[in-house]
Amino acid sequence: MTQESNSNFFNFLLFGFVTAIAFYSGTQFNKSSEQEEHINHANLYSVKKFDDGAKEYSIMLITDLDHDSKDGKKWKSLVSRGFLKVSADHKHADIHFDKDSEYYVDTNIAAGGRAMELSDLAVFNGKLYSIDDRTGLIYQISDKKALPWVLLNDGPGNVVKGFKGEWITVKDTELIVGGLGKEWTTTDGVYVNDHPMWVKHVSAHGAVHHENWKDVYIRVRRAAGIEYPGYMIHEAVQWSAIHRKWFFLPRRMSNEKYSEAEDENRGTNVLVIGNEELTDFEVVRVGSENNKSRGFAAFQFVPNTHHQLIVAIKSEEKDGKPVASYASVFDIHGNVILDEYLLHGPYKYEGIAFA
C-alpha cells in the first residue's frame, strides 16, 4: 500500500469513527430530550474598563482558507485574536489585533480532499464551537486545538454528504447551525436540491434534530423584495435572547438567478430582522454605501449594549480566491459606528466571537 493510500485509509477510518459517534449521539436524542437541559451560560471573553467608561473586549476570529487549508497530510485554519473597544456612549469603536497571538488549528479528518474550512464561531454551554463547511463536523476550539464533537449530515440528515454549515447561533438550550439558505444549484443556477435550506438543532448532549427552513428563507428574501429564481445567501444569522428576534445579515442577494461568475459582486448592506416565529420581518439598510464585492460573513452582538450594537465581518473574493476581510460596528438601526476596517492578511475571516 502506498503512502498516499495509507493516508487516505487513515482519513477514512477517522471519518468513520466520528460518524459512529454522531450516530450514537443521534440515538440518544429521545433520552436526552427527556432530561432537563442545564446550560452553562458563562462568558469566555475578558473585559477591560477605562476611566472614561469605555470597555474593551477580547475577540477571536477564524478563517476559511479554502484550498490553502491543505498543509501536507493535515488541514488547517488560522485563528486571530484581538480587542474591540467601545466608548461609554456607544458612539465610537476601535479594533486592534495581536499578531503574536495568532495560531493554527488543524485536523486529519477530510472529505473529498478538503477540510478545516471553518465557518462562524459560537459560545455554547461554556465552550467555543465552529463548523467545518466541508465535512459537516462541529469542532470545539480549546487550548489551541480543534476537537471533533458532532457530525452533521446534509439536508434532512439521511444523506452521506456532510452539511455545509455556514452560520451558528444559540437559542435557549440549543446550538442552531444553518447553511447557505438558498436552493443548491449548478454554477449556472440550475436547481439541484433544497439541502442548504435545512437547519440543525444540536443539544448540549450532542443530539441532532433536523428542521426544514425552506419557507423561512423564502420569507426572509421576500421581505427584501427577492423572489425565485432570485436568491439570498446567508452566512451571518443570530438569535437575540434580549429582543426575542432573529437577525440576518445576508452575504449576497440578487433578483437574477444564481451565477457563480456574477455572485462575487452581489454583496449586500441589508439587515433583516424577524420575529421569533419567523413570520414577520423588517429590513434595515446598514450605512449609505455598499461595496458589492464585499459580503457579510459573520457577526455578534456586542456585550453590555442590550444587543443594540453589532460587530460584523465582511469578506471579499476575486475569482474564487480571498482578497481581504473587513470589520465594522453598527447599531440595529443601521447607523455605522466603525466603518469597514481592513483586517490584516488576504484571508477570508468567517467567524467572530467574544472569547
Swiss-Prot record:
Transmembrane segments: 7-29
Cellular localisation: Endomembrane system
E.C. no: 3.6.1.6
GO biological process: ATF6-mediated unfolded protein response; determination of adult lifespan; endoplasmic reticulum unfolded protein response; gastrulation; GDP catabolic process; IRE1-mediated unfolded protein response; nematode pharynx development; proteoglycan biosynthetic process
The entry's keywords: Calcium, Glycoprotein, Hydrolase, Membrane, Metal-binding, Signal-anchor, Stress response, Transmembrane, Transmembrane helix
EC class: hydrolase
Family annotation (InterPro entries): Apyrase, Apyrase_sf
Cytoplasmic membrane side: 1-6
Cofactor(s) listed: Ca(2+)
Catalysed conversion reaction: a ribonucleoside 5'-diphosphate + H2O = a ribonucleoside 5'-phosphate + phosphate + H(+)
GO MF term set: calcium ion binding; GDP phosphatase activity; UDP phosphatase activity
Pfam families noted in UniProt: Apyrase
Triggers of expression: By ER stress.
GO CC, alphabetical: endomembrane system; membrane
Record family assignment: Belongs to the apyrase family.
Functional description taken from the UniProt entry: Hydrolyzes UDP and to a lesser extent GDP. By preventing the accumulation of NDP, may promote the reglucosylation of incompletely folded glycoproteins in the endoplasmic reticulum following the unfolded protein response.
Protein name per its UniProtKB record: Apyrase apy-1
Organism: Caenorhabditis elegans
Name of the coding gene: apy-1
